[in-house]
Amino acid sequence: MTILSDVKALGQQIWLDNLSRSLVQSGELAQMLKQGVCGVTSNPAIFQKAFAGDALYADEVAALKRQNLSPKQRYETMAVADVRAACDVCLAEHESTGGKTGFVSLEVSPELAKDAQGTVEEARRLHAAIARKNAMIKVPATDAGIDALETLVSDGISVNLTLLFSRAQTLKAYAAYARGIAKRLAAGQSVAHIQVVASFFISRVDSALDATLPDRLKGKTAIALAKAAYQDWEQYFTAPEFAALEAQGANRVQLLWASTGVKNPAYPDTLYVDSLIGVHTVNTVPDATLKAFIDHGTAKATLTESADEALARLAEIAALGIDVETLAARLQEDGLKQFEEAFEKLLAPLV
């Protein structure tokens, strides 16, 4: 047993927030799964770093440049191959839990963040190209992305809804998921295989707010917000309305804690893992945070601890004139811009 196995026994999956060809081909990813890692997430920034720093791509890049393809098509050829290979490594994990774990995420183009129909079309295409049952298509949680979520769920596609900072937007996502499930059930189709995670970003909240807060509140907002979001989750998915869908095979959306590497070196390096362990959740962690947690993290069900205190802390922050929903909208826009910039950098060498 490892600490990751202990976390899994507490109802939380630990995923790796990284993907590269070397990670898969070296056997390192397979070794991480043996330690208790349950899935993988990727994004444009991760692929940009992989393509720039992993020599295993060089020959394929050269070969793809000789073909009459756009830079985006060249990127997708390599990214789809990597995700497919990672899905194969994670397949045994996926099957051992009846399809509940072992997913690998690939994101739609950041250029489509405000285009619901474009997102749906690209997600369908990427899902078909990967052709693995444990592939998850990542979609940003803009209003357009949430509209796309409903359609993709009704299509039977598993989705990672990303860049969530807002409790209100997260609740909108749950409702869209439920509508997609209801449509699929009304059409007489199975829903048991569909898994959706709602990726709620953590450390960026504290990074954005800490400079404006008194010392006693620094480093506390993100965890308080996550705990409040989990209370919202419990209320939504234990209500009679969703219970009726669950009785017909629907899975609950799982909250996924993203951006859980600490940005402030004054904070413990496992802060955003240790503090957010709970049932029906996922935490996707970068390599350094994973190593730190394995070395000196604590496996304890902490997510429901001090729930009232979390709400009181948010009220205290609101009393200072800080609107966390306004902040959430800004952070999502910033995140979209960062992914767009990473995508442009990623494509530049593929021209």
Curated annotation (Swiss-Prot):
<feature type="active site" description="Schiff-base intermediate with substrate">
    <location>
        <position position="138"/>
    </location>
</feature>
<dbReference type="GO" id="GO:0004801">
    <property type="term" value="F:transaldolase activity"/>
</dbReference>
<keyword id="KW-0963">Cytoplasm</keyword>
<dbReference type="GO" id="GO:0006098">
    <property type="term" value="P:pentose-phosphate shunt"/>
</dbReference>
<dbReference type="Pfam" id="PF00923">
    <property type="entry name" value="TAL_FSA"/>
</dbReference>
<keyword id="KW-0570">Pentose shunt</keyword>
<keyword id="KW-0808">Transferase</keyword>
<protein>
    <recommendedName>
        <fullName>Transaldolase</fullName>
        <ecNumber>2.2.1.2</ecNumber>
    </recommendedName>
</protein>
<comment type="similarity">
    <text>Belongs to the transaldolase family. Type 2 subfamily.</text>
</comment>
<comment type="function">
    <text>Transaldolase is important for the balance of metabolites in the pentose-phosphate pathway.</text>
</comment>
<dbReference type="InterPro" id="IPR013785">
    <property type="entry name" value="Aldolase_TIM"/>
</dbReference>
<dbReference type="GO" id="GO:0005975">
    <property type="term" value="P:carbohydrate metabolic process"/>
</dbReference>
<dbReference type="InterPro" id="IPR001585">
    <property type="entry name" value="TAL/FSA"/>
</dbReference>
<keyword id="KW-0704">Schiff base</keyword>
<dbReference type="GO" id="GO:0005737">
    <property type="term" value="C:cytoplasm"/>
</dbReference>
<dbReference type="InterPro" id="IPR018225">
    <property type="entry name" value="Transaldolase_AS"/>
</dbReference>
<comment type="pathway">
    <text>Carbohydrate degradation; pentose phosphate pathway; D-glyceraldehyde 3-phosphate and beta-D-fructose 6-phosphate from D-ribose 5-phosphate and D-xylulose 5-phosphate (non-oxidative stage): step 2/3.</text>
</comment>
<dbReference type="InterPro" id="IPR004732">
    <property type="entry name" value="Transaldolase_2"/>
</dbReference>
